[in-house]
Amino acid sequence: MSAISGDWLEALKGEFHQPYYAKLYKTVMTEYQTRKIFPPADDLFNAFHFTPLNEVKVVIMGQDPYHNDGQAHGLCFSVKRGVETPPSLVNIYQELHDDCGCYIPNNGYLEKWAKQGVLLLNTVLTVRAHQANSHRGIGWEQFTDAAIQVLNEQDRPIVFLLWGRPAQMKKSMLNNPKHLILEAPHPSPLSAYRGFFGCKHFSKTNEFLVANGLEPIDWQIENI
Protein backbone atom coordinates (compact mmCIF):
# COMPACT_ATOMS: atom_id res chain seq x y z
CA MET A 1 0.00 0.00 0.00
CA SER A 2 1.43 3.36 -0.97
CA ALA A 3 2.20 5.89 1.74
CA ILE A 4 1.43 9.57 2.05
CA SER A 5 4.52 11.73 1.63
CA GLY A 6 5.56 15.37 1.60
CA ASP A 7 3.72 18.08 3.50
CA TRP A 8 0.57 15.99 3.81
CA LEU A 9 2.57 13.45 5.82
CA GLU A 10 3.62 16.14 8.28
CA ALA A 11 0.06 17.48 8.53
CA LEU A 12 -1.57 14.09 9.05
CA LYS A 13 1.15 12.23 10.96
CA GLY A 14 -0.91 12.28 14.14
CA GLU A 15 -3.57 10.16 12.47
CA PHE A 16 -1.18 7.30 11.75
CA HIS A 17 -0.68 6.73 15.49
CA GLN A 18 -4.39 6.60 16.32
CA PRO A 19 -6.00 3.24 17.17
CA TYR A 20 -8.61 3.67 14.43
CA TYR A 21 -5.89 4.00 11.78
CA ALA A 22 -4.10 0.84 12.90
CA LYS A 23 -7.40 -1.01 12.57
CA LEU A 24 -8.14 0.65 9.21
CA TYR A 25 -4.69 -0.22 7.86
CA LYS A 26 -5.03 -3.86 8.89
CA THR A 27 -8.51 -4.10 7.36
CA VAL A 28 -7.44 -2.52 4.07
CA MET A 29 -4.31 -4.66 3.79
CA THR A 30 -6.37 -7.81 4.35
CA GLU A 31 -8.92 -6.68 1.78
CA TYR A 32 -6.21 -6.08 -0.84
CA GLN A 33 -4.71 -9.50 -0.14
CA THR A 34 -7.98 -11.43 -0.27
CA ARG A 35 -10.31 -9.53 -2.60
CA LYS A 36 -10.32 -7.32 -5.67
CA ILE A 37 -10.11 -3.76 -4.38
CA PHE A 38 -10.11 -0.43 -6.21
CA PRO A 39 -8.14 1.68 -6.76
CA PRO A 40 -4.92 -0.33 -7.15
CA ALA A 41 -2.94 -0.08 -3.91
CA ASP A 42 -0.24 2.09 -5.49
CA ASP A 43 -2.90 4.67 -6.45
CA LEU A 44 -4.59 4.81 -3.06
CA PHE A 45 -3.24 8.20 -1.96
CA ASN A 46 -2.92 9.81 -5.40
CA ALA A 47 -5.07 12.79 -4.39
CA PHE A 48 -2.43 13.68 -1.80
CA HIS A 49 0.52 12.85 -4.09
CA PHE A 50 -0.72 14.93 -7.03
CA THR A 51 -1.82 17.93 -4.94
CA PRO A 52 0.53 18.85 -2.08
CA LEU A 53 -1.13 20.64 0.83
CA ASN A 54 0.69 23.91 0.19
CA GLU A 55 -0.61 23.94 -3.40
CA VAL A 56 -4.30 23.27 -2.69
CA LYS A 57 -6.56 26.01 -4.08
CA VAL A 58 -9.76 24.04 -4.64
CA VAL A 59 -11.25 20.96 -2.97
CA ILE A 60 -13.77 18.71 -4.73
CA MET A 61 -15.15 15.93 -2.56
CA GLY A 62 -16.41 12.61 -3.81
CA GLN A 63 -17.80 9.65 -1.88
CA ASP A 64 -16.11 6.33 -2.62
CA PRO A 65 -14.06 5.26 -5.66
CA TYR A 66 -15.52 3.93 -8.89
CA HIS A 67 -15.99 0.19 -8.43
CA ASN A 68 -15.71 -1.19 -11.97
CA ASP A 69 -12.55 -2.49 -13.63
CA GLY A 70 -9.93 0.03 -14.70
CA GLN A 71 -11.74 3.15 -13.54
CA ALA A 72 -10.50 4.31 -10.15
CA HIS A 73 -7.00 5.70 -9.73
CA GLY A 74 -7.21 7.71 -6.53
CA LEU A 75 -8.76 10.98 -7.74
CA CYS A 76 -12.48 11.51 -7.23
CA PHE A 77 -14.59 11.69 -10.41
CA SER A 78 -11.49 10.90 -12.54
CA VAL A 79 -10.92 7.71 -14.54
CA LYS A 80 -7.83 6.35 -16.22
CA ARG A 81 -7.05 7.13 -19.83
CA GLY A 82 -8.88 4.89 -22.28
CA VAL A 83 -11.82 4.30 -19.94
CA GLU A 84 -15.29 5.57 -20.85
CA THR A 85 -16.16 8.83 -19.10
CA PRO A 86 -18.64 8.04 -16.28
CA PRO A 87 -22.06 9.75 -16.26
CA SER A 88 -21.35 12.16 -13.39
CA LEU A 89 -18.18 13.37 -15.10
CA VAL A 90 -20.08 13.73 -18.39
CA ASN A 91 -22.37 16.13 -16.53
CA ILE A 92 -19.42 17.98 -14.99
CA TYR A 93 -18.02 18.47 -18.49
CA GLN A 94 -21.42 19.71 -19.69
CA GLU A 95 -21.53 22.32 -16.93
CA LEU A 96 -17.94 23.32 -17.73
CA HIS A 97 -18.94 23.76 -21.37
CA ASP A 98 -21.94 25.89 -20.45
CA ASP A 99 -20.12 27.87 -17.74
CA CYS A 100 -16.64 28.38 -19.16
CA GLY A 101 -16.85 27.38 -22.82
CA CYS A 102 -14.65 24.30 -22.43
CA TYR A 103 -15.03 21.69 -25.14
CA ILE A 104 -16.10 18.24 -23.95
CA PRO A 105 -13.00 15.99 -24.09
CA ASN A 106 -12.75 12.36 -25.11
CA ASN A 107 -11.41 11.17 -21.74
CA GLY A 108 -12.04 11.47 -18.02
CA TYR A 109 -8.47 11.77 -16.76
CA LEU A 110 -8.35 14.76 -14.38
CA GLU A 111 -4.67 14.81 -13.42
CA LYS A 112 -4.38 18.26 -15.03
CA TRP A 113 -6.74 19.66 -12.41
CA ALA A 114 -4.89 17.95 -9.55
CA LYS A 115 -1.54 19.32 -10.74
CA GLN A 116 -3.00 22.87 -10.62
CA GLY A 117 -4.09 22.61 -7.00
CA VAL A 118 -7.51 20.96 -7.24
CA LEU A 119 -7.63 18.31 -4.51
CA LEU A 120 -9.88 15.51 -5.79
CA LEU A 121 -10.66 13.77 -2.52
CA ASN A 122 -13.00 10.86 -1.95
CA THR A 123 -14.18 10.62 1.65
CA VAL A 124 -13.72 6.82 1.46
CA LEU A 125 -10.53 5.83 -0.35
CA THR A 126 -11.16 2.17 -1.24
CA VAL A 127 -14.00 -0.06 -2.45
CA ARG A 128 -14.54 -3.72 -3.26
CA ALA A 129 -14.94 -4.46 -6.96
CA HIS A 130 -18.53 -4.01 -8.10
CA GLN A 131 -19.80 -3.24 -4.57
CA ALA A 132 -20.49 0.47 -4.13
CA ASN A 133 -19.96 1.80 -0.59
CA SER A 134 -18.55 -1.56 0.56
CA HIS A 135 -15.79 0.17 2.57
CA ARG A 136 -18.01 2.79 4.14
CA GLY A 137 -17.53 2.86 7.90
CA ILE A 138 -14.19 1.04 8.14
CA GLY A 139 -12.32 4.21 9.17
CA TRP A 140 -11.58 6.21 6.04
CA GLU A 141 -14.14 8.86 6.96
CA GLN A 142 -12.22 9.70 10.13
CA PHE A 143 -8.98 9.96 8.18
CA THR A 144 -10.37 12.17 5.40
CA ASP A 145 -12.19 14.31 7.98
CA ALA A 146 -8.76 14.97 9.49
CA ALA A 147 -7.54 16.10 6.06
CA ILE A 148 -10.56 18.39 5.72
CA GLN A 149 -9.81 19.89 9.14
CA VAL A 150 -6.21 20.53 8.07
CA LEU A 151 -7.49 22.28 4.95
CA ASN A 152 -9.94 24.38 6.95
CA GLU A 153 -7.08 25.56 9.17
CA GLN A 154 -4.95 26.80 6.27
CA ASP A 155 -4.34 30.53 6.53
CA ARG A 156 -5.09 31.23 2.87
CA PRO A 157 -8.16 31.19 0.62
CA ILE A 158 -9.39 27.78 -0.58
CA VAL A 159 -12.57 26.99 -2.52
CA PHE A 160 -14.63 23.99 -1.38
CA LEU A 161 -17.05 22.58 -3.95
CA LEU A 162 -19.66 20.52 -2.11
CA TRP A 163 -21.80 18.53 -4.53
CA GLY A 164 -24.57 16.41 -3.06
CA ARG A 165 -25.67 15.78 0.50
CA PRO A 166 -22.73 13.62 1.68
CA ALA A 167 -20.24 16.33 0.67
CA GLN A 168 -22.44 19.06 2.13
CA MET A 169 -22.41 17.27 5.48
CA LYS A 170 -18.77 18.36 5.74
CA LYS A 171 -19.78 22.03 5.70
CA SER A 172 -19.99 22.12 9.49
CA MET A 173 -16.23 21.48 9.59
CA LEU A 174 -15.50 24.52 7.41
CA ASN A 175 -15.59 27.68 9.52
CA ASN A 176 -12.56 29.61 8.24
CA PRO A 177 -13.83 32.92 6.81
CA LYS A 178 -10.97 32.99 4.28
CA HIS A 179 -12.50 30.08 2.37
CA LEU A 180 -15.31 30.03 -0.19
CA ILE A 181 -17.90 27.25 0.09
CA LEU A 182 -20.07 26.52 -2.95
CA GLU A 183 -22.88 23.98 -2.78
CA ALA A 184 -24.92 22.25 -5.49
CA PRO A 185 -26.71 18.96 -6.09
CA HIS A 186 -24.52 16.03 -7.12
CA PRO A 187 -23.67 15.85 -10.86
CA SER A 188 -25.12 12.34 -11.04
CA PRO A 189 -27.81 11.91 -13.73
CA LEU A 190 -30.24 11.40 -10.84
CA SER A 191 -29.75 14.92 -9.48
CA ALA A 192 -27.83 17.13 -11.93
CA TYR A 193 -31.02 18.73 -13.23
CA ARG A 194 -31.97 19.85 -9.73
CA GLY A 195 -29.38 22.60 -9.76
CA PHE A 196 -25.95 21.26 -10.63
CA PHE A 197 -26.49 22.39 -14.20
CA GLY A 198 -26.31 26.16 -14.07
CA CYS A 199 -24.44 26.37 -10.75
CA LYS A 200 -21.47 28.06 -12.45
CA HIS A 201 -19.10 26.78 -9.78
CA PHE A 202 -16.12 26.71 -12.12
CA SER A 203 -16.30 30.37 -13.11
CA LYS A 204 -17.17 31.39 -9.53
CA THR A 205 -14.11 29.50 -8.31
CA ASN A 206 -11.84 31.33 -10.73
CA GLU A 207 -13.37 34.72 -9.91
CA PHE A 208 -12.62 34.08 -6.23
CA LEU A 209 -9.07 32.90 -6.91
CA VAL A 210 -8.28 35.91 -9.10
CA ALA A 211 -9.82 38.29 -6.54
CA ASN A 212 -7.40 36.82 -4.00
CA GLY A 213 -4.36 37.21 -6.24
CA LEU A 214 -4.17 33.54 -7.24
CA GLU A 215 -3.87 31.94 -10.66
CA PRO A 216 -7.22 30.69 -11.96
CA ILE A 217 -7.67 27.01 -12.79
CA ASP A 218 -7.47 26.00 -16.44
CA TRP A 219 -10.43 23.62 -16.35
CA GLN A 220 -10.05 22.41 -19.94
CA ILE A 221 -9.16 18.71 -20.06
CA GLU A 222 -7.61 18.10 -23.47
CA ASN A 223 -8.42 15.31 -25.88
CA ILE A 224 -5.93 12.46 -26.03
Where are the language model's segments positioned?
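A polyanion-binding, active-site-adjacent surface
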Residues: 2, 14-162, 166-169, 174, ...
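Short, contiguous pre-domain boundary segments
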Residues: 5-9
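C-terminal substrate-binding/active-site "lid" region of AdoMet-derived donor-dependent transferases
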Residues: 196
